A protein has these predicted regions:
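N- or domain-start disorder-to-order transition segments that initiate the globular core
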Residues: 14-49
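Active-site-proximal beta-strand/loop segments in catalytic clefts of secreted hydrolases
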Residues: 55-57, 85-88, 141-144
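Solvent-exposed, acidic/flexible segments
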Residues: 35, 39, 59-67, 93, ...
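Membrane-embedded segments
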Residues: 60-65, 69-86, 90-100
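Acidic/histidine-rich, surface-exposed loop or edge segments in extracytoplasmic proteins
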Residues: 47-57, 107-111
């Protein structure tokens, strides 16, 4: 009888699923507290909010591998509503929809999506390929280049009690600079507020 209990415990333990850690070295650190997190702690924290914004250093392969791991792992913990990518513009959305509706993926997926050369397909391709196989929508989250240039040339006038306050602009400029690792030229910063 004791052997049966041991066997049952071992079988049940084998059914427990724990996401594998991200396929990269280094530490996961909470930038607000400095606390080092395990992969499981990170997933537990990110599974709670309705929306998660994930960024990367655009040319860092480890960041992209971690993003793919995170997308796959969160999908096992909770339903995903959608995936929005800064790399996709509204004029590409119909192409994304066509690829999703096709019976088999095109041999040249980046070409079928009219993927922009500025976003290295070798790094972003695995994330896009995975997202296209999921039940949730893959959506464009950027503006077309013409729209961006129009905002830069003629920024809209914002209304609201605090929208134009210098303190708010200073905070927003700081966040924009931080989210781009301090790599944006100062001359581009004011236009980013548009």
């Amino acid at each position: 009888m004791r052997g049966m209990w041991l066997l049952a415990v071992l079988l049940l333990a084998g059914c427990q699923h724990v996401a594998a850690p991200p396929p990269i070295g280094g530490q996961i650190r909470d930038l607000h507290s400095g606390q080092v997190l395990t992969a499981q702690q990170l997933l537990a924290r990110l599974a709670e909010p309705d929306r998660v914004i994930v960024g990367e250093q655009h040319d860092n392969a480890d960041h992209h591998a971690a993003q793919l791991w995170l997308l796959q792992s969160l999908g096992e913990l909770r339903p995903q509503g959608s995936l929005l990518l800064e790399m996709l513009t509204p004029d590409q959305q119909a192409k994304v929809t066509a690829v999703r509706q096709s019976v088999s993926p095109p041999s040249d997926l980046s070409g079928a999506l009219a993927w922009q050369e500025g976003w290295d397909w070798k790094l972003y391709g695995p994330i896009v390929r995975f997202a296209l196989t999921q039940p949730y929508p893959l959506l464009a989250a950027n503006l077309d280049n013409g729209e961006i240039r129009a905002f830069y040339r003629n920024p809209p006038v914002l209304s609201g009690e605090r929208s134009n306050a210098e303190a708010v602009k200073t905070i927003l400029l700081g966040q924009i600079g931080d989210s781009h690792c301090g790599l944006l030229p100062d001359s581009q910063m004011p236009a980013m507020l548009a």
